[in-house]
């Protein structure tokens, strides 16, 4: 299975100034367009509850799986329309979730944040590809893209300019 980590970050490696800040507040429209395109291509997005709360709604035409420790949310798994819009709240380890999705025939997923979720999937060595958009901003403090996961070797696949100011980098995990 392809497990694709997608993140936008500041030049100094921050994905937000605080845990309740949406990346939509400071990233380029081209980065948003890339995220929409890639997540529609895979059809399945995994993110943490805090990241979901910054978005506040399901993503049209995609299956959104929200990792949460709030057991009361787990019963709120909803198929919202015939176009594949689906919202699920789960309390599973990354490995268990990936095994379940593979058994369902899912071929690729996007890991959409935040830092804790990125770190969890990296720690378990599940990520196969990383797309990072570098935005032209530096935050004096904030949320790191990931931490506490050990060294990971990457192979540079390519880069692309998004708009006039942002750069999208693609790496494969080796």
Where are these regions (language model features)?
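Enzymes that bind and transform nitrogen-containing heteroaromatic metabolites
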Residues: 1-174
């Amino acid at each position: 299975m392809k497990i694709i980590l997608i993140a936008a970050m500041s030049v100094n490696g921050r994905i937000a100034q605080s845990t309740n800040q949406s990346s939509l507040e400071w990233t380029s429209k081209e980065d948003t367009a890339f995220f929409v395109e890639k997540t529609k291509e895979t059809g399945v997005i995994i993110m943490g509850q805090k990241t979901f709360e910054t978005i506040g709604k399901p993503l049209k035409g995609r299956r959104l799986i929200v990792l949460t420790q709030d057991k009361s949310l787990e019963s709120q798994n909803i198929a919202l329309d015939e176009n594949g819009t689906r919202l699920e709240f789960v309390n599973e380890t990354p490995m268990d979730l990936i095994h379940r999705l593979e058994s369902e025939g899912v071929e690729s997923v996007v890991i959409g944040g935040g830092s804790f979720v990125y770190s969890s999937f990296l720690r378990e060595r599940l990520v196969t590809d990383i797309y990072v958009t570098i935005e032209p901003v530096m935050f004096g403090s904030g949320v790191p893209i990931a931490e506490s996961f050990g060294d990971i070797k990457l192979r540079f696949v390519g880069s692309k300019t998004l708009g006039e100011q942002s750069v999208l980098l693609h790496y494969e995990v080796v």
